[in-house]
Regions:
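Acidic loop->beta-strand submotif enriched in PP2C/PPM serine/threonine phosphatases
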Residues: 1-3, 96-135
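Primarily the active-site beta-strand->alpha-helix module of PP2C/PPM metal-dependent phosphatases
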Residues: 1-51, 115, 123, 135-147, ...
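Beta-strand scaffold of nucleotide-dependent catalytic cores
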Residues: 9-11, 78-81, 198-201
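DG-centered beta-turn motif at the end of beta-strands
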Residues: 12-13, 83, 121-129, 183
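Short, surface-exposed beta-strand-loop junctions and turns on beta-sheet-rich folds
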Residues: 14-16, 83-86, 94-95, 130-131
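Short helix/loop capping segments that flank catalytic or ligand/cofactor-binding pockets
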Residues: 18, 89, 125, 132-134, ...
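Catalytic core of PPM/PP2C metal-dependent serine/threonine phosphatase domains
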Residues: 21-92, 109-110, 159-194
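C-terminal catalytic subdomain
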Residues: 130-207
Length: 207
């Protein structure tokens, strides 16, 4: 969270386990730190390419990312690299913002710019979500269209972003039968009007 915007970054490192976690954590940290300092996506991608440790087995440094930045005036910027596309609901209905692709440092990054409306919900997730159930309850896994249908069907106007995230993770855990075959990460952003809280502080009553 920043004075002029709120930033949400989701990353998924190559492979699984500790190595993947390190790659994802570094990627998210680099993007968050640079963008809070008003750096652009070009600088973020270049820094990631120069910073991530190279895998000895595969000989590359790799991590997907999805960025959602919401300014306090409602302007939204998103950037996605090589992960599943985020799912957006507006008034409880699926909505697909217009996107443009740019090649940055050899990577195809999809960007979008739009203005949010109250109660918009943006759900980002790693490919562990769409791979849920492969070879188990669903032979070919859970497709993105299935994820979209689930999100829309389970959406409620009063639902928090945490609840949507938990619901999606729970159904993935069910499809994996409690044994995830891939790292599964979900991040949800819900647009809400700013509210004011007043706190009164004073000496304790002598009574």
């Amino acid at each position: 969270h920043h004075d002029v915007h709120t930033l949400c970054t989701l990353s998924d490192g190559m492979g699984s386990g500790v190595k993947a976690n390190i790659l994802a954590t570094l990627t998210s940290k680099i993007i968050s730190t640079l963008m809070i300092g008003n750096a652009g996506i070009d600088e973020c991608v270049e820094t990631i390419s120069e910073t991530l440790p190279v895998c000895r087995e595969r000989g590359i440094a790799y991590s997907t990312f999805t960025i959602v930045r919401v300014k306090h005036n409602g302007e939204v910027y998103t950037a996605e690299f090589d992960g599943p596309e985020f799912v957006m609901l507006r008034n409880g209905v699926l909505d697909e913002p217009e996107k443009e692709m740019r090649v940055i440092g050899g990577k195809e990054v999809w960007e979008s710019h739009f203005f949010a409306e109250p109660e918009d919900m943006i759900v980002s997730f790693s490919d562990g979500v769409i791979h849920a159930g492969i070879g188990r309850l669903i032979n070919l896994g859970w497709k993105r269209v299935n994820v979209m249908e689930f999100i829309q069907r389970n959406y409620d106007l009063k639902m928090s972003s945490r609840t949507m995230t938990r619901n999606l993770l729970e159904v993935c855990d069910h499809l994996y039968e409690g044994e995830p075959g891939d790292d599964t990460t979900v991040a949800t952003v819900r647009i809400m009007p700013r509210t004011t809280t007043r706190v009164m502080v004073g000496p304790a009553s002598s009574a």
